Amino acid sequence: MSETVKFTCQRVPREIGAFTGFAELNEYRRKLRELGMIGVDANGIGFGNLSIRDGATSRFYITGSGTGGTADLIPSDYARVVAYDFAKNWLRCEGPTVASSESLTHAAVYESEPTVFSVIHGHDVKLWAALLEEEATATPKGVEYGTPEIAYAVRNLFKVTDMERRKILQWPGMKEGSWHLGEMREKRLGRYSDRRSEAKCSVAAMLYVTPV
């Protein structure tokens, strides 16, 4: 998957300080990098991204574009998405970096389900194949990443499937890709157990699995 940003981004340069959930999200990201679900491919293109809702709003913090190869992120490696328009394929973000190419898909999740507090998009061919075999909730084939179509598809899946309950989404058109959605529980991130390795940390997330 290319990390090329396809949307029009209006970036407002602004310092990003440590936000609520920053440490927990980074810890989960480190574990996913160890598993190879986030990183850089043979062509030097980064893959995988994480985000966390900004309080009870539809705004969110998301890893910046091209950060897959960075071992440990600091607050300035994140962008705060404050507005978006699916039809115009546009978003506004704050911070020193451009928001991840998957930002509009994350926005579709937060807009569709208020209980989701974090979103993780990771790449793992084994998990992707397992989800494909069990016919997990999936986006339509042929829908490209970073487009209004994928955002609309995700919103529709919340309406017509049990994704709200399962909190995992597979992307058939992107081998190894999946998404995990998390809930906010008592103002804290819950615990999520990675299905492949059983590695645990304090972040609960919706996983969106796509292949590399």
Regions found by a protein language model. Name each.
Residues M1-V212:
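Glycine-rich flexible loops
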